[in-house]
UniProtKB/Swiss-Prot annotation:
Upper lineage: Bacteria, Pseudomonadati, Pseudomonadota, Gammaproteobacteria, Pseudomonadales
EC nos: 6.3.4.20
Listed HAMAP family: QueC
Gene Ontology annotations of biological process type: queuosine biosynthetic process
Transmembrane segments: none
Name of the coding gene: queC
Molecular function GO terms recorded: ATP binding; ligase activity, forming carbon-nitrogen bonds; zinc ion binding
NCBIfam families assigned: 7-cyano-7-deazaguanine synthase QueC
Family: Belongs to the QueC family.
Annotated organism of origin: Pseudomonas putida (strain ATCC 700007 / DSM 6899 / JCM 31910 / BCRC 17059 / LMG 24140 / F1)
Name used for this protein in its record: 7-cyano-7-deazaguanine synthase
Length: 224
């Protein structure tokens, strides 16, 4: 039987941890990729390593990037405050072209591994309004992936899988719990402290808390 491999973007948060569990349940050998890109804290990278170990991935890779050299986001520029109240439009926590960059590197690793599937935990229901989380973006990237790679041109097509795309945060939590995700290992907060404790005020914290509440499941998040 041929091994079914997948590269999965793993941030260390709730959504990406759920995606790893979903891919594993579908019989994939999971290769996870995280990025040290100049974000506000390293707690999410520590969380990603914990999740990768707990879910038994084949290999977990951390890639260094200097997106803080570009700036333009509250997540990569410490002079921009993380908003603690809902606002209009695309928030300042949007990191310019982040998912495009991350998926491009995942695509490269997938080609090396001869993996045909790349998973990403984007969501367009309970989300912050980022343009690179929409179905149109995922579909467009998949088309590009199959035009821009040796494997794609030779007919070994790639699939960009976004299984959470149309799920509510409550549904995501329920799906993860059903597949054995330990959410106490994850960190979602935009401004978590070094110990991984959350602020409870940012948009990501609100979405996470609302998801657990709507799912009727106890939230294991620790706050500072």
């Amino acid at each position: 039987m041929t091994e079914k491999r997948a590269v999965i973007l793993l941030s260390g948060g709730l959504d990406s941890a759920t995606v790893v569990a979903m891919a594993k349940a579908e019989g994939y050998s999971c290769y996870t990729m995280s990025f040290d890109y100049g974000q506000r804290h390293r707690a999410e990278l520590n969380a990603a390593a914990r999740v990768a170990h707990d879910l038994g991935v084949v290999e977990h890779k951390v890639i260094g990037l200097n997106l803080d050299g570009i700036g333009g986001s509250a997540l990569t520029d410490s002079s921009i405050d993380v908003p603690e109240a809902p606002g209009e439009g695309i928030p300042v926590t949007y990191v310019p072209a982040r998912n495009t960059v991350f998926l491009s590197l995942a695509l490269g690793w997938a080609e090396v591994l001869e993996a045909r599937d790349i998973f990403i935990g984007v969501n367009a229901v309970d989300y912050s309004g980022y343009p690179d989380c929409r179905p149109e973006f995922v579909e467009a990237f998949e088309r590009m992936a199959n035009l821009a790679t040796k494997a794609g041109v030779e007919g070994q097509g790639f699939r960009i899988q976004a299984p959470l795309q149309n799920m509510s945060k409550a549904q995501i939590v329920q799906a993860g719990m059903a597949r054995g995700v330990d959410y106490s290992l994850t960190v979602s907060c935009y401004q978590a402290d070094d110990d991984g404790r959350a602020c409870g005020k940012c948009d990501s914290c609100r979405l996470r808390a609302d998801g657990f509440k709507a799912a009727g499941i106890e939230d294991p998040t620790r706050y500072f």
